[in-house]
């Protein structure tokens, strides 16, 4: 093997190992507390409370928006939409927004530890909100100290799995409403279409301690699942990631830019990709990048006048140039808006890349991207988490790639 390629492969392996160790340690330590937090959150939702998530930095903004999407638009057919808001810097400072919006029954979830975020948490607690934060000394009622993880990209990946597991398991307690404060007990719960998420749960469980124990085990199982899927994604596609990192570095150094897109939770991943290139958390230089999910005026205009299939296509026509790189994120690989954008990107001479799930969908079957990375799962939260690891590693590999030789 080429020595440079061997070094790159070793780096991918090391990045994977760091993630596996951090994931195992965090969830082994915190699974029981996470189960109890799910119960407390369910009590708030049962009182018609809302989740109010907020973050100030570009990366934290993407997480606030991601967690809101998951609660409002559940991927499990038949599960209720739970009210959630994602507040970010577009509305000004965060603390005044939270002070204006938060209500006593709400759940306040803070991403980041800037003074503005800490002030927002204080305002939420004053209102009577249940408060959750991912940094120490935040003043939140529920703190999960991710600061002990040195790599900021890994911290963000662990946070994503954390809030996915909260969303996945809150529904258990809502289905067992007799376990919620102020609610009459019911003899059975109905996990229905979500039963695949909770393999440890019996259908007539009524004891809180027993359900908490089951939820803890389910959270640990999900932590194992993402570790395995992350390993598959980064190991199977290590060579492809190295090649993509080199090509992306060449295009960026030549004046091109990265253009990212996705739908739903994957739209917030596109936000994060662009944040990682524009304002990298790991100390690398800023790189040119554009988020096609950002301008709601353009998206809604195209959706209204033409149709949702064209929301990215029209923007690729407007912004895409030969020399740019188009990066698509899709859990299914079948979204028509993604397929149309990739086809147009190729017509324009752009390098096309895609992170997909399942078996790769139409993106992989029809070779619609030059570089395809498949997280082989049908579990949408786990796919998104593996994608985050994939594009975070890709971002680091861009800086490890040698710049193109001078002509």
Each language-model region and where it sits:
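N-terminal, charged amphipathic alpha-helical interaction modules
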Residues: 244, 265-266
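Glycine-rich phosphate-binding loops that contact phosphosugars or nucleotide phosphates
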Residues: 56-179, 266-406
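Short, surface-exposed connector motifs at secondary-structure boundaries
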Residues: 22, 49-50, 104-107, 254-257, ...
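N-terminal amphipathic, basic helical "cap/leader" segment at the start of enzyme domains
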Residues: 248, 260, 267-269
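Cofactor-/ligand-binding subdomain signature composed of acidic, glycine-rich
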Residues: 1-25, 182-233
């Amino acid at each position: 093997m080429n020595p440079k390629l061997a070094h790159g492969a070793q780096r991918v392996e090391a990045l994977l190992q760091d993630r596996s160790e951090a994931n195992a340690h965090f969830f082994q330590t915190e699974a029981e507390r996470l189960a109890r937090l799910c119960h407390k959150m369910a009590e708030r939702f049962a009182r018609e409370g809302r989740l109010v998530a907020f973050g100030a930095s570009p990366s934290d903004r993407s997480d606030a928006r991601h967690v809101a999407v998951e609660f409002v638009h559940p991927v499990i057919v038949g599960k209720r939409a739970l009210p959630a808001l994602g507040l970010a810097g577009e509305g000004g400072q965060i603390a005044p927004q939270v002070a204006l919006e938060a209500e006593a029954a709400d759940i306040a979830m803070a991403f980041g530890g800037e003074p503005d975020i800490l002030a927002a948490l204080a305002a939420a607690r004053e209102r009577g909100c249940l408060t959750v934060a991912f940094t120490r000394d935040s003043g939140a009622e529920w703190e999960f100290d991710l600061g002990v993880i040195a790599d900021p990209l890994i911290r963000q990946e662990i946070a994503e799995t954390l809030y996915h597991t909260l969303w996945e398991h809150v529904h258990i307690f809502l289905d067992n409403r007799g376990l919620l404060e102020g609610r009459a007990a019911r003899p059975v719960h109905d996990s229905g279409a979500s039963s695949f998420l909770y393999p440890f749960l019996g259908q007539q469980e009524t004891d809180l301690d027993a359900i908490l124990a089951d939820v803890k085990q389910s959270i640990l199982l999900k932590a194992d699942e993402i570790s395995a899927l992350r390993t598959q994604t980064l190991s199977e596609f290590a060579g492809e990631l190295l090649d993509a990192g080199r090509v992306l570095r060449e295009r960026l150094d030549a004046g091109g830019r990265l253009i990212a897109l996705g739908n739903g939770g994957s739209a917030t991943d596109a936000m994060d990709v662009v944040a990682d290139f524009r304002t990298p958390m790991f100390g690398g230089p800023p790189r040119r990048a554009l988020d096609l999910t950002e301008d709601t005026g353009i998206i809604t205009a195209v959706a209204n006048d033409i149709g949702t299939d064209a929301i990215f296509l029209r923007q690729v026509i407007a912004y895409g140039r030969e020399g740019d790189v188009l990066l698509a994120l899709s859990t299914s690989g079948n979204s028509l808006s993604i397929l149309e954008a990739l086809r147009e990107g190729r017509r324009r001479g752009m390098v096309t890349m895609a992170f997909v799930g399942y078996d790769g969908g139409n993106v992989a079957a029809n070779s619609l991207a030059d570089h395809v990375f498949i997280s082989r799962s049908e579990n949408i939260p786990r796919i998104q988490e593996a994608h985050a690891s994939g594009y975070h590693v890709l971002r680091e590999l861009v800086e490890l790639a040698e710049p193109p030789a001078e002509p």
